[in-house]
Design a protein with these regions (language model features):
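Well-ordered beta-sheet/strand-loop patches within structured domains
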Residues: 2-283
């Protein structure tokens, strides 16, 4: 179902709100915010024309136990991927749609793996989104063109071996739409479960996944895994078969500062609204 948007005229709204508050004498207010209705880029009538008819595949991950900032960043990143359309033959780039990741773009500091350390940085947790998209693409029988596993196995991406790390500008996660119609990506969070669903037109292909299998597991937490994606056409002929190997190092090689990543002063590039939201999540 199509939904029309509403764009607020921020300058007019600021002046209107300030004027109404000034004249209210502390009484309750009902303010009609100025703005304009915006048509959806893709309407319901366009869906059949583009081939958005049925479910192709589903990917899920579980982020139970995530710190508040991590959950916040996951939800913020998801805003970039609602109803993304991937054209036939197009290569989807996660980093391209994600855009900038910093305080100015609404992200909070949380732990990331970078420079051989586990340290707080804006956007920690976004890989929950990229890993879920990876799984949806795999189960939809699409061609993965770029993917890298995390430096060490992270509990939020079980089963191990089906994660996809990203960092702007690289590493990126990419897949190619190998169908003859558009693919639409939709996501939802239910409790601690993040789900991506890919919609398009089924062409008779079937996808089978073998694994992931743990090939080797060290006492230091290091691990090697592999899984295989096999895709057959409507006649049962295999036309795509890829193995995805993951080599995880020991977590001890990446110093961890602990769970306390709280800021005590407002970063200079943050708005007051961002700082209030941060303090609300981190009392």
């Amino acid at each position: 179902r199509e939904v029309y948007g509403f764009v607020i005229d921020q300058e007019k709204a600021k002046k209107l709100i300030a004027d109404e508050i000034r004249m209210s004498n502390h009484s309750p207010l009902v303010i009609n915010i100025p703005g304009q209705s915006v048509e959806p880029k893709i309407k319901a009538s366009d869906m059949d024309k583009l081939g958005i008819k049925e479910l192709l595949g589903v990917g899920t991950t579980n982020f139970k136990g995530s710190p508040k900032n991590r959950v916040y960043n996951i939800k913020r990143a998801l805003e970039q991927f609602q109803s993304v359309m991937v054209a036939p033959g197009e290569e989807f780039s996660f980093v391209h749609y994600l855009g900038e990741v910093d305080g100015e773009h609404g992200y909070l500091p949380e732990l990331v793996i970078r420079n051989n350390k586990t340290e707080p940085e804006f956007g920690g947790g976004i890989c929950q989104v990229s890993s879920t998209v990876f799984r949806a693409a795999i189960y939809s029988g699409l061609k993965i063109t770029e993917r890298r596993n995390h430096s060490y196995a992270v509990q939020y991406y079980k089963p191990y071996g089906m994660d996809a790390t990203i960092y702007v500008p690289r590493p990126d996660f990419k897949f190619k739409n190998t169908t003859d119609n558009y693919i639409m990506m939709q996501s939802v969070i239910e409790g601690d479960i993040l789900t991506f669903r890919f919609f398009g037109t089924k062409d008779g292909r079937t996808t089978s996944i073998d694994g992931p299998h743990i090939l080797e597991r060290g006492g230091d937490g290091s691990m090697r895994t592999v899984f295989t994606q096999e895709v057959k056409d409507k006649d049962g002929t295999v036309f795509q078969k890829d193995s995805f190997a993951s080599n995880y190092k020991s977590p001890s090689l990446f110093p961890h500062p602990g769970e306390d990543t709280k800021l005590t002063t407002k970063p200079s590039n943050w708005s007051n609204t961002q700082w209030r939201e941060y303090k609300r999540l981190n009392p």
